[in-house]
Amino acid sequence: MVGHSLSELLPNPWPLRVLSAFAVGLWCLAVFRSTSSQQREVRLWALALIPLMPAFVFSLGNAVRQGLASVIILHAAIFLMDKKRWQFAFLSVLGVLVHEVSIVFVAAVAAMRMPMSWARAFLLISPFVSFIVVWISARFDVDLASYVRYAGYDEGAFHYLKFAVYFSLANGLLFLSTRRAEADHFHLMAKAFALTVGCASLLLVYEVPFERMVLYSDVLLPVMLAMSVVNLKLGVLGRIWLVGGLLALGFAFWTSDSVQTTLTEGKAHAEDGRIQFYKIPD
């Protein structure tokens, strides 16, 4: 409804720009809500890391409904971490109404208080599930791809590299969460991240569905990575190297062909009328 109203008031592509900016603002607000006023350095690092997250471009810059839903559910997750269940339920429903597939992210967040051993087991088993299910269904002449959205878009095997990165991150964050003495949200966010990556890995055999699903986990990363960096207690030289590395990573990320193509095509779709009245084919 909001998107429809914006499309009536503003020319393309401004409705999408407004929604994207609103979602980015919500993401930044979540950084402050999930940290205390004493964690100023964590907040600074987290805000600096947001533009380096793939979801910043591929969700908030293209699949806008998914990006908006993911940050709404991030706020729902923060409420749940503080044991405010009614607020969690309300924002979760709102997020699912924005983008129905977000119910998977809601499920992962809702299960973040499960035992650590269960979260690890799910993360380890999930990559094999889709291949086993596809193999079994093929034996019975069942085409699962016809039931999975975007399953027909197969452009290669690059997503397996992405899986390796996210899988390693999930395991690393779970390990770090067991070493933290601070009473913060890190351990719950680590489990939510691992469960979201696990849910995405259930679709690992399908490139685009996996890549779209794993983007939900990105909204959890900036705060956890920032907390990890601050805990390293780096000296001046270490901070210089880290900042330099992040600047180089940011330059490589924002000048990459995939990012430029995503942003250019998304803008073209809006300007030439292919996105009408917020009917976004994402």
Q: Each predicted region: which residue ranges?
A:
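Membrane-interface transmembrane helices that cradle and orient dolichyl/undecaprenyl
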Residues: 73-86
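Transmembrane-helix signature of polytopic, membrane-embedded enzymes
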Residues: 31-52
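Short hydrophobic/aromatic helix or loop-helix immediately within or flanking a transmembrane segment
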Residues: 1-10
